[in-house]
């Protein structure tokens, strides 16, 4: 059983979701949002870093999936999003997690079955797949979707030789 962390990065709200991949499916472990407030960007990035670090310490995932930066119409927003991603990635690297990146389309395809799904469809499928009674916050459900996508992609690699890959320095090398 593998614990997987999913991160939906943002400079104001970063969603996180932790699932347990049992090999026969995924089970819900935890989810939530790291809220940074309206302070200076450097302080908000520190909050993202510390928040992700705390989630990793608390739940002990060994691998992380994170959403890739999309091309936003507003360059300033895209840069801030990229910096928030960087803060989350550094927290994961410092904890020794293996990291994979997924586009929003890949996540929607893995969770809903279509890359054209909206956030509410992802949220409903996350609830169904993880047998959740209450709706998670939208950023947390996106993060859980990223974790489910990561679990799906990890499983699809196993028949193609990943199981025979050699471990070097604590990281899988193909």
Curated annotation (Swiss-Prot):
Cofactors named for this entry: Mg(2+)
PROSITE patterns: RUVC (PS01321)
SUPFAM superfamilies: Ribonuclease H-like (SSF53098)
Reactions listed under catalytic activity: Endonucleolytic cleavage at a junction such as a reciprocal single-stranded crossover between two homologous DNA duplexes (Holliday junction)
Record GO cellular component, one term: Holliday junction resolvase complex
Gene3D superfamilies: Ribonuclease H-like superfamily/Ribonuclease H
Keywords: Cytoplasm, DNA damage, DNA recombination, DNA repair, DNA-binding, Endonuclease, Hydrolase, Magnesium, Metal-binding, Nuclease
GO MF term set: crossover junction DNA endonuclease activity; DNA binding; magnesium ion binding
Main subcellular localisation: cytoplasm
Record: residues binding Mg(2+) 1: 8, 139
Keyword Nuclease assigned: yes
InterPro entries according to UniProt: RNaseH-like_sf, RNaseH_sf, X-over_junc_endoDNase_Mg_BS, X-over_junc_endoDNase_RuvC
Active site, per annotation: 8, 67, 139
Coiled-coil residue spans: none
UniProt binding sites for Mg(2+) 2: 67
Cofactor: record remark: Binds 2 Mg(2+) ion per subunit.
EC number: 3.1.21.10
Places the protein is found: Cytoplasm
A Gene Ontology BP annotation from the UniProt entry: DNA repair
Oligomeric form and interacting partners: Homodimer which binds Holliday junction (HJ) DNA. The HJ becomes 2-fold symmetrical on binding to RuvC with unstacked arms; it has a different conformation from HJ DNA in complex with RuvA. In the full resolvosome a probable DNA-RuvA(4)-RuvB(12)-RuvC(2) complex forms which resolves the HJ.
Function field: The RuvA-RuvB-RuvC complex processes Holliday junction (HJ) DNA during genetic recombination and DNA repair. Endonuclease that resolves HJ intermediates. Cleaves cruciform DNA by making single-stranded nicks across the HJ at symmetrical positions within the homologous arms, yielding a 5'-phosphate and a 3'-hydroxyl group; requires a central core of homology in the junction. The consensus cleavage sequence is 5'-(A/T)TT(C/G)-3'. Cleavage occurs on the 3'-side of the TT dinucleotide at the point of strand exchange.
Family named by the database record: Belongs to the RuvC family.
Protein name: Crossover junction endodeoxyribonuclease RuvC
Gene (name only): ruvC
